[in-house]
Amino acid sequence: MRYVIEMIVKALVDDGESVDIREVEQRGATLIEVRVAPNDVGKIIGKQGRTIRALRSLARIGGSKKNRRYLLEIVE
């Protein structure tokens, strides 16, 4: 799941080199932390949060196929 999110995020931002994705285990779920350059945060969130909602939906769907729970957060 990390690889899929990383490829999508790198395609969305201007500075693909600054993208850092980490997976952290938390209370029976896997938290995917996305770090990008400060000027790219708005591109990840999108208009009215549509882009981040879509990314979270992809993570949730991918997790359901593996019987896992994935959460996605943008970390500054």
Predicted regions mapped to residue ranges:
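RNA-contacting regions in translation and RNA-metabolism proteins
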Residues: 1-43, 52-76
